[in-house]
């Protein structure tokens, strides 16, 4: 869920409920682009980095760091870092779709 409290699932449901059918990128589209996930926790820190490799070989990264070492949990750090990396795919794919539509005369 985003900082606005309006997450992908809610957005998808609203789009479908309103019958909006224009070209768009869906959460499923993003997920199909991801071919590999790499994680690294820097020793002695709470910093977790996720690198998502996309079908075309492009890599996007996200990170997470607990302020307090007592609150560090690697599984949670991985989830937050992955979400941050995945979030970076949206604008890139949106740009590619808009460019494709533009070239088609839309």
Which ranges hold each PLM region?
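Domain-level marker for long, solvent-exposed, non-transmembrane regions
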Residues: 1-106
């Amino acid at each position: 869920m985003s900082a606005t409290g309006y997450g992908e699932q809610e957005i998808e449901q609203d789009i479908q409920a309103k019958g909006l059918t224009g070209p768009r990128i869906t959460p499923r589209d993003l997920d199909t682009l991801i071919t590999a996930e790499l994680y690294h926790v820097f020793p002695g820190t709470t910093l977790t980095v996720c690198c998502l490799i996309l079908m075309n070989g492009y890599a996007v990264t996200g990170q997470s760091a607990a302020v307090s070492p007592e609150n560090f949990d690697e599984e949670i750090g991985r989830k937050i870092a992955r979400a941050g990396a995945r979030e970076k795919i949206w604008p890139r794919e949106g740009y590619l779709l808009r460019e494709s539509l533009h070239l088609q005369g839309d």
